[in-house]
Curated annotation (Swiss-Prot):
Record-listed Phosphotyrosine modification sites: 148
Effect of residue 295 to A: Complete loss of kinase activity
Function: Secreted tyrosine-protein kinase that mediates phosphorylation of extracellular proteins and endogenous proteins in the secretory pathway, which is essential for patterning at organogenesis stages. Mediates phosphorylation of MMP1, MMP13, MMP14, MMP19 and ERP29. May also have serine/threonine protein kinase activity. Required for longitudinal bone growth through regulation of chondrocyte differentiation. May be indirectly involved in protein transport from the Golgi apparatus to the plasma membrane.
Location of the Protein kinase domain: 138-422
Family stated for the protein in its record: Belongs to the protein kinase superfamily.
Listed Low complexity bias regions: 37-47
Lineage of the species this protein comes from: Eukaryota, Metazoa, Chordata, Craniata, Vertebrata
Protein name, as recorded: Extracellular tyrosine-protein kinase PKDCC
Domain of life: Eukaryota
Originating organism: Mus musculus (Mouse)
Amino acid sequence: MRRRRAAVAAGFCASFLLGSVLNVLFAPGSEPPRPGQSPGSSAAPGPGRRGGRGELARQIRERYEEVQRYSRGGPGPGAGRPERRRLMDLAPGGPGLQRPRPPRVRSPPDGAPGWPPAPGPGSPGPGPRLGCAALRNVSGAQYVGSGYTKAVYRVRLPGGAAVALKAVDFSGHDLGSCVREFGARRGCYRLAAHKLLKEMVLLERLRHPNVLQLYGYCYQDSEGIPDTLTTITELGAPVEMIQLLQTSWEDRFRICLSLGRLLHHLAHSPLGSVTLLDFRPRQFVLVNGELKVTDLDDARVEETPCTSSADCTLEFPARNFSLPCSAQGWCEGMNEKRNLYNAYRFFFTYLLPHSAPPSLRPLLDSIVNATGELAWGVDETLAQLETALHLFRSGQYLQNSTSSRAEYQRIPDSAITQEDYRCWPSYHHGGCLLSVFNLAEAIDVCESHAQCRAFVVTNQTTWTGRKLVFFKTGWNQVVPDAGKTTYVKAPG
């Protein structure tokens, strides 16, 4: 598997002329044909599978209708006047996406909807900007990863920008299990591709700073599969929890705040309350320190129907919650509560309280406890996270700190080379680099470290505007350095 993907990425990097390379990367035609099968033919259904084709068509139609519902669920944020257009495709001559030819909607047998999908009644918002033409001369292709349905690659556009490409993984479990069951590769591709299309629609409809940006998409005929779909999105770094536990509390708090803002947006989205059925960290990425959801094919908008509260049990591995059944026959707030508890068990409990400023711990503990008990909704949770941000950013969390009586000599436009020591958590693995609100906090930190004899205030700031400071064991090697200020502990 790895050998195959490495070869794919190498070919991808060499040219990526869409008419040929996308065929190799994303189409089953890149696989050797079976004995007695022409390279462009689809696998024929085995004995007894004719009835199975009807089941496959039913599943395709079900996913197609889901995509249509999300597409016409009202204008997304910032949407202008709705325009008639093919679902997620701009009209010929439009300002954004370009196709090498007009789209052809094909009607498969057995009652399945055509592919690509037919037009919806309205636009999901301003169209993405990139299309097939943007991918003609990409470079530096790298395989990022794959899941049940999709494979993700990292490429660099001719202008230098790095983006992510998503497509149905022809070696993946989703497509493979479908082909084994129904023996219809094209139909199974359409079934899997509707999940990618659903994600594309939701990325457009749910646009938000903590939702991955959709830059564009491309439909391309491939060997044996017409109109294979590739989406072009913002590129992020995978969420590695072990690495995050070694970062500063300030950066970990930013991730939790990002998540709180995302959940608030999902609870009040233009489509209604959206729940993420798969909430594992791998469904998110980090972009410049901000957490963003990237995988939306398992998102659900509809609340759970019920006839009584007995139907409204929210189940998790460690515990269950009982929610009320509304008079309208829906479990009240189940989508919101599911998101919130998953945020608690996957993120808040690990990232929020540890190594936080002592004066903020009571507030942070209350956030963790309340989300773990589902005592708060997303509105109150976000309000408390924003309060913690205000206290931290304004320096009010320092109101109970006592200023040190130690005196420090100020040496402007200077720095100390070497003489480092390690502390945790630090922004620098080889030294002690921490953020401080002001000079008084820097002195307090130095006084609390037995080995600290000096510190250097840099000209760098964190996302909250706090200064980054190097703490040192001495000042034997003070050198000129414009923009930095060294403070050394006075003798005595």
